[in-house]
């Protein structure tokens, strides 16, 4: 089971780990049963990629390229009509390639299997839960290495083994011992290049410049594969990176194991003080990972000359000749985590109406890495703290609670090392009042609650012992002495991180107010409003440090930021047993959260206030404001100069808005000062979900929708032709861009050009899109018969969004990240128990 804690009173006992909320995961335990419950599940799954950006075919690509080459400023050689028509006709694929790189490398569906066996049982003295699971899956890549003559199959092949063992023993009437032993083992095999980079590579390469490979011969006596390529690219020895060759010429293996042991002791101390209990926890976690990589270089070729009439051609090598022997390398990593916790709990009811609870907690955690590379990594990383809680409830109606946490961190100097974080909460359960008796059949429960508290965060994001200085003894500062050939340069020390003994805790003040309502014993509604002010946020100093201090290149960390976050959470839960055959339930959640930057490391005065992020949300975009596309030369001439963006604009280029300085003056020049923060943040401000569950006789059906709103996507890295790599052409660009024949100033893409058009590649509102979406996240139908359950389920089945270029859940960028997966599961579950 999963539960999430967010307010300060709920997270106080977790110390620094609870600064940004806590997720509690509880695994199953045993139970006092006459007979054990045995459960077996077998499942298969089909996986596919949800939405892949559609690329233009070879003919469309070349015609678009020639359109860009026709600009007056272009010196590029356009594709010949013979090549275009030969490609259209599907002639010799080595002279007229039309490669769909995505189809070459990726398949439509992949398959996964999963099996799980668990047993649960026990008696009053001992209970147990044991689970064994195995999962095997392959990826959506095609198996190509054997096709090209390699002895290995480097397609993704992943096997996971999971073991859970929980044992509880009632050693004495007052002593309970619990032991949990969990293991997770993962064996991974796949290509040397990451799946994400391979996917991006299929998008980045155009379909027409070279085939996947050439047949053997053509003047070269070699048994190696003659991979297709084009000279002049960024590959280290000349040419480009052939996506298929990059995929098949290597593989790597990874073995990861995570072993966790938890030992708990619960001792009733009622023989000394009634209601007093001691709880102890010892937890040890070991993580180990080993990697082996085997990879070879490859030789690539391009067409040197060709005879269109006969179809004959000659080849030449791109770059230097490379050896193709497989080279092997490996590495090992791991870490160990130790956690100790001791608590004293007191619970007692006085006079039948006064409930008093108290707890005192001590915890300590230690982290060690198995890969010691420097002084810091050789030292154990430790945190420790104490916490306490006192709560009182009168007759189940009036409730009050007070907490404190006192935590220490190695990231701060001795004077700031420990922080004190108190919190309080009150509640009023109106429905337990006597005057509520007549209302209770309708309003079953009504509770008002509120809390205030402080939380502390020590995660600076800058490594360990952040307050200490870090000096590079071989840095760039130094001096040169001697003359002529006797000149010698000596390097000197430099600060890479400046010391700050005043660095302290990042502190969040949290206020929560909520209401819990239940109607007719079946409809539950929870509404909670929250506000958090986070101060002393860790930031590195930038433009506020003058150069004359001599700290150029050194990072200076300090408590510089302040932010406010307000919002609300709403949840609905409805459960109704309509009759003996029909059960209905519905769940819905809604969260709204809006943050505002109050302070950060910025100059106290700016000539252009629009460049300040203060008053805006974290994750908003600093963008040029577009006015659409320039319709003609006259408009360009009559508007502010945009040459400072690195390109002289022409009709069809993006037209930007000039912004004034703090005096309201316009400089009639478009440059970096003409940007401001616009749009919604990258992280959505609204997240919601809803879905029903229905059980009718032996059938069950459920589905769940999940959506986000008030979020923006900024498109970037999508521009064809003018990049350093052979950029592919997205179909939506080919379908809707500005042309001299169709001068649509509202086109989705400006005019095509082969140059690096700095005017059109600026981050601007022209590329800003609404990132909202609603997804059918899960759906399942099942049938149960005498302990057997058959089911069919799916994940990421449907997506509704105004943004349709790629899966909006992937966020900003070019859509070249590995997409989310659609999964169809089909399985069987059988349970044997004591019924």
Placement of each model-derived feature along the sequence:
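Conserved small-residue
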Residues: 39-92, 193-198, 464, 575-682
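Extracellular/periplasmic, surface-exposed regions of secreted and cell-surface proteins
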Residues: 109, 166-175, 180-185, 211-212, ...
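Extracytoplasmic gating/loop element in the C-terminal half of outer-membrane beta-barrel translocons
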Residues: 73-79, 239-245, 308, 708-789, ...
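Short Pro/Gly-enriched beta-strand edge/turn motifs at strand-loop
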Residues: 95-102, 372, 671-674, 761
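Membrane-proximal, glycine/serine-rich, low-complexity loop/turn segments characteristic
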Residues: 1-3, 9-256, 264-266, 459-480, ...
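A generic structural motif
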Residues: 136-138, 408-410, 576, 682-684, ...
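Conserved SET/PR-domain catalytic core that frames the SAM/AdoMet-binding pocket
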Residues: 587, 597, 674, 684-697, ...
């Amino acid at each position: 089971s999963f539960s999430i804690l967010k307010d300060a009173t709920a997270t106080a006992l977790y110390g620094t780990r609870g600064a940004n909320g806590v997720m509690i995961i509880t695994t199953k335990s045993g139970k006092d049963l006459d007979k054990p419950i045995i459960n077996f599940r077998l499942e298969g799954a089909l996986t596919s990629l949800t939405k892949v950006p559609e690329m233009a075919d070879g003919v469309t690509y070349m015609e678009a390229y020639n359109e860009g080459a026709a600009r007056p400023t272009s010196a590029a050689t356009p594709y010949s009509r013979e090549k275009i028509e030969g490609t259209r006709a599907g002639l010799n694929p080595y002279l007229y390639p039309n490669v769909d790189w995505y189809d070459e490398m990726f398949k439509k569906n992949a398959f996964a299997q999963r099996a799980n066996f668990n047993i649960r049982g026990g008696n009053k003295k001992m209970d147990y839960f044991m689970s064994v699971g195995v999962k095997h899956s392959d990826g959506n890549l095609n198996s190509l290495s054997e096709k090209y003559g390699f002895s290995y199959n480097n397609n993704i092949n992943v096997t996971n083994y999971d073991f859970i063992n929980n044992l509880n023993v009632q050693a004495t009437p007052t002593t309970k011992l619990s032991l949990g032993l969990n293991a997770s083992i993962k064996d991974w095999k796949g290509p040397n290049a990451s799946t994400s980079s391979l996917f991006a590579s299929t998008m980045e390469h155009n379909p027409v410049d070279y085939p996947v490979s050439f047949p053997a011969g053509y003047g070269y006596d070699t048994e190696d594969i003659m991979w297709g390529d084009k000279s002049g690219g960024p590959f280290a020895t000349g040419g480009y990176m052939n996506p298929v060759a990059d995929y098949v010429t290597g593989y790597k293996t990874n073995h990861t194991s995570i072993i966790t042991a938890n030992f708990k002791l619960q001792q009733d101390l009622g023989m000394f003080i009634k209601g007093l209990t001691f709880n102890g926890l010892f937890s040890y976690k070991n993580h180990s990972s080993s990697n082996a990589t085997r990879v070879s270089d490859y030789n690539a070729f391009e067409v040197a000359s060709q005879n269109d009439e006969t179809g004959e051609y000659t080849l030449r090598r791109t770059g230097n000749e490379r050896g193709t022997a497989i080279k092997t390398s490996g590495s090992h990593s791991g870490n160990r985590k130790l956690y100790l916790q001791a608590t004293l709990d007191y619970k007692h009811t006085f006079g039948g109406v006064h409930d008093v609870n108290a707890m005192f907690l001590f915890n300590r955690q230690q982290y060690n890495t198995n890969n010691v590379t420097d002084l810091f990594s050789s030292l154990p990383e430790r945190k420790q703290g104490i916490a306490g809680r006192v709560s009182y409830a009168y007759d189940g109606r009036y409730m009050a609670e007070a907490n404190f946490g006192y935590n220490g961190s190695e990231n701060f100097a001795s004077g700031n090392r420990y922080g004190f974080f108190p919190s309080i909460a009150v509640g009023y359960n109106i429905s337990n009042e006597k005057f509520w008796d007549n209302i209770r059949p309708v309003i079953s429960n009504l509770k008002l609650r509120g809390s205030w508290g402080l939380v502390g965060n020590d995660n600076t994001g800058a490594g360990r012992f952040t307050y200490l200085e870090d000096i590079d003894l071989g840095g760039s500062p130094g001096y040169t002495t001697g003359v002529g050939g006797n000149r010698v340069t000596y390097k000197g020390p430099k600060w890479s991180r400046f010391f700050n003994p005043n660095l302290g805790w990042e502190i969040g003040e949290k206020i929560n107010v909520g209401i819990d309502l239940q109607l007719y014993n079946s409809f539950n509604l929870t509404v909670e409003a929250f506000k958090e002010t986070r101060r002393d946020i860790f930031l590195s100093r930038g433009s506020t440090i003058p150069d004359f201090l001599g700290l150029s290149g050194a990072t200076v960390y300090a408590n510089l930021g302040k932010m406010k976050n307000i919002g609300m959470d709403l949840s609905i839960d409805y459960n109704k047993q309509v009759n003996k055959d029909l059960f209905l339930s519905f769940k819905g959640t809604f969260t709204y959260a809006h943050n505002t930057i109050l302070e950060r490391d910025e100059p106290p005065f700016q000539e252009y206030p629009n460049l300040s992020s203060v008053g805006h949300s974290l994750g908003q975009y600093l963008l040029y404001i577009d006015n659409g596309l320039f319709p003609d030369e006259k408009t360009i001439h009559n508007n502010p100069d945009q040459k400072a963006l690195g390109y002289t604009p022409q009709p069809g280029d993006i037209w930007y808005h000039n912004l004034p300085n703090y005096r309201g003056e316009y400089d009639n020049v478009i440059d970096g000062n003409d940007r401001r923060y616009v749009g919604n943040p990258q992280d959505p401000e609204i997240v919601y979900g809803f879905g029903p569950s229905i059980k009718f006789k032996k059938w069950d059906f459920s589905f769940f929708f999940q959506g986000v709103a008030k979020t923006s996507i900024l498109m970037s890295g999508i521009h064809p032709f003018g990049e350093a790599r052979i950029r592919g052409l997205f179909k939506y660009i080919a379908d809707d861009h500005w042309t001299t024949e169709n001068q649509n100033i509202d086109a989705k893409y400006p005019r095509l050009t082969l140059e690096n058009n700095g005017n059109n590649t600026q981050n601007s509102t022209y590329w800003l899109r609404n990132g909202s979406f609603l997804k059918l996240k899960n759906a399942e139908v099942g049938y149960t018969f005498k302990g057997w359950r058959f089911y069919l389920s799916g994940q990421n089945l449907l997506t509704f969004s105004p943004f349709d270029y790629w899966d909006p859940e992937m966020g900003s960028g070019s859509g070249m990240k590995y997409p989310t997966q659609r999964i169809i599961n089909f399985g069987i579950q059988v349970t044997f128990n004591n019924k």
